[in-house]
């Protein structure tokens, strides 16, 4: 007769012990565990999208620029994280859960409803990447809270550049070809530099211009001396190198 309550108490004690061990960890380890969980969940939920993106990149398609967006966003996030925190240490878990679940619901609707509806334009729109963005963002809200996510709002906004249609239009506007693809990705590095260094509007503008100047110089070198380089080199090297140089100089 006493087995039931004892079992419940044992289960509660086990949960409390697990929570205590988790919160006893160094904050860096807790941060790593949370991001590890988000990455694993995203890889499991969107493995087909990731495999498709890898295949597109291996085939030398324009869609490989998405990796440049991801790498640039990670670099910019590190720069933003180094700034002095200004938000109040207030956390409302109910709001976090509501906002996180709503965003995740929208992502699920895009993945399950809109994606099949616009299957003919899959490579042009890549709505699955938009759904993945919503999944990661909502997971971050649920695990970290809304205020910490808002602190990196510009970085999250930058990650929306994985929606490929504007990039494709920019490449066509610049004339098409590998050099045009590289020039279009410099828009990513310019935006990233402005966010990373933009403690003021003036600093952000100067950083963006500097990233574009350095990026176009590197792109010219690749076009002239390494003309046969793969498309991914045109898309990644000038943009990421310019972002790193501006970040180091700042």
Regions found by a protein language model. Give the residues of each.
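Hydrophobic N-terminal alpha-helices or hydrophobic patches in metabolic proteins across all domains
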Residues: 2-250
């Amino acid at each position: 007769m006493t087995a039931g309550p004892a079992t419940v108490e044992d289960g509660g004690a086990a949960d409390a012990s697990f929570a205590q061990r988790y919160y006893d960890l160094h904050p860096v380890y807790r941060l790593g565990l949370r991001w590890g969980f988000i990455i694993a969940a995203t890889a499991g939920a969107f493995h087909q999208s990731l495999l498709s993106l890898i295949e597109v990149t291996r085939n030398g398609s324009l869609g490989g620029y998405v990796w440049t967006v991801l790498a640039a966003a990670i670099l910019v996030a590190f720069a933003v994280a180094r700034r002095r925190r200004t938000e109040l240490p207030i956390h409302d878990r109910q709001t976090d859960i509501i906002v996180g679940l709503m965003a995740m619901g929208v992502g699920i609707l895009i993945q399950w409803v809109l994606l099949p509806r616009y299957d003919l334009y899959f490579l042009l729109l890549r709505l699955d990447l938009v759904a993945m963005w919503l999944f990661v963002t909502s997971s971050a809200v649920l695990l970290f809270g809304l205020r910490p996510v808002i602190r990196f709002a510009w970085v999250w906004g930058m990650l929306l550049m994985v929606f490929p249609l504007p990039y494709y239009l920019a490449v066509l506007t610049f004339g098409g070809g590998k050099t045009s693809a590289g020039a279009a990705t410099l828009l990513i590095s310019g935006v990233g530099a402005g966010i990373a260094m933009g403690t003021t509007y003036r600093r952000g503008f100067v950083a963006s211009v500097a990233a574009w100047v350095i990026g176009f110089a590197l792109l010219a070198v690749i076009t002239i001396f390494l003309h046969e380089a793969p498309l991914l080199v045109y898309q990644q090297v000038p943009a990421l190198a310019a972002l790193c140089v501006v970040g180091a100089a700042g």
